[in-house]
């Protein structure tokens, strides 16, 4: 067994919004990455969630923009005193896009599928602690855990835990059917995915009638598309060096947020000289994380102190333990011999 010590950098995400988008009932959203397929429960690709999460598919809970957790398909829940039982009450009147009813049986199917022995869910480890999923009645489902897990509600908000209908699984990678505010319409691979408003949505009706996701991988083409206003929004704009120009242009808004993306530089602590803790501490103090962020991402990023992004409930800021200090680094190397 070996141990890993890492340099951690949190990656910021920039979204550009054209002012003209605010007065339309349709929107064109540009993304750099195209999904490999459209089943968020069977691949690690974040590009799937970028298009489908909360738009087409929903989970029992969901993320807000600040990383907090709010009810999704579950309107409420109760947690037993020992932390082993979660009882979820589902919203009544929820239907899938094919008109069939979403109920506790669909929740059981989805979670059992995610945690099954043969599951290909990219986050399967998050759900293996669920020992049993029991349908109490059509609107009530009970989860029993093998041990308490304070992150369960957070884990259930991931795109990997969205609720799907058993009948839709065969074609889910090409024609996804969910419960969200938008329905899948069309996918022109290499170009775009089109969604339309779900008029039978159980929640607040969306203001938009149509949403188109365009895939533009080349930074130069991305810049040109924004400047020509061919797109209304570019989420995760791939060329941060262009952001000051957009910020100075009254046609656009630039929004900076956080992502689950971390840049991690790791070393093998079992091999000399890295098996010496003083050498590892010296390396940590020799690296200017902010300078890397400034150079590689033009300042759009955050030095982080754990393996989690700052909005994750498990995040602990330990950056003070490895602050950039060349003199201290040299002294530690001298002590290490």
Predicted regions and their residues:
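N-terminal lobe/hinge region of extracytoplasmic solute-binding protein
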Residues: 31-81, 112, 177-179
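Aromatic- and charge-enriched surface segment that lines or borders ligand/interaction sites
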Residues: 75-120, 136, 142, 225, ...
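Gly/Pro-rich hinge or "lid" segments in bacterial periplasmic/extracellular proteins
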Residues: 148, 154-206, 210, 218, ...
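Append "and occasionally in soluble cytosolic enzymes with long acidic Gly/Pro-rich linkers
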Residues: 197, 275-337
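Ligand-binding "clamshell"
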Residues: 25, 243-256
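Short, well-ordered beta-strand elements
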Residues: 25-33, 75, 85-88, 107-110, ...
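Ligand-site clamp/hinge motif
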Residues: 170, 198-244
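Surface-exposed binding/hinge segments that line
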Residues: 89, 123-164
């Amino acid at each position: 067994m070996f141990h890993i010590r890492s340099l951690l950098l949190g990656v910021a995400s920039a979204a550009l919004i054209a002012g003209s988008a605010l007065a339309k009932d349709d929107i064109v959203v540009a993304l750099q990455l195209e999904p490999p397929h459209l089943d968020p429960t069977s691949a690690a690709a974040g590009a799937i969630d970028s298009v489908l999460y909360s738009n087409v598919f929903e989970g029992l809970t969901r993320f807000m923009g600040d990383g907090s957790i709010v009810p999704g398909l579950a309107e409420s829940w109760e947690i037993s005193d020992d932390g082993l039982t979660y009882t979820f009450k589902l919203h009544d009147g929820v239907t899938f896009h094919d008109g069939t009813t979403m109920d506790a049986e669909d929740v059981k199917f989805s979670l059992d599928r995610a945690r099954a022995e043969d599951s290909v869910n990219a986050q399967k480890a998050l759900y293996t602690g669920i020992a049993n999923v029991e349908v109490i009645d059509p609107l009530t489902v009970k989860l029993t855990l093998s041990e308490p897990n304070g992150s369960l509600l957070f884990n259930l908000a991931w795109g990997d835990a969205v609720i799907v209908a058993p009948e839709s699984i065969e074609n889910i990678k090409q024609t996804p059917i969910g419960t969200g505010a938008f329905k899948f319409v069309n996918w022109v691979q290499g170009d775009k995915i089109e969604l339309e408003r779900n008029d039978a949505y159980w929640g607040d009706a969306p203001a938009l009638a149509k949403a188109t996701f365009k895939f533009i991988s080349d930074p130069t083409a991305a810049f040109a598309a924004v400047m020509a206003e061919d797109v209304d929004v570019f989420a995760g704009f791939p060329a941060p060096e262009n952001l000051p120009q957009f910020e100075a242009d009254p046609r656009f808004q630039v929004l900076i947020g956080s992502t689950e993306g971390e840049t991690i530089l790791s070393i093998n602590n079992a091999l000399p000289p890295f098996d010496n803790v003083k050498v590892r501490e010296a390396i940590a103090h020799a690296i200017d994380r902010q300078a890397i962020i400034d150079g590689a991402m033009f300042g759009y990023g955050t030095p982080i102190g754990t393996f989690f992004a700052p909005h994750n409930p498990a995040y602990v800021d330990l950056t003070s333990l490895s602050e950039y200090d060349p003199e201290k680094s040299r002294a530690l190397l001298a002590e290490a011999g």
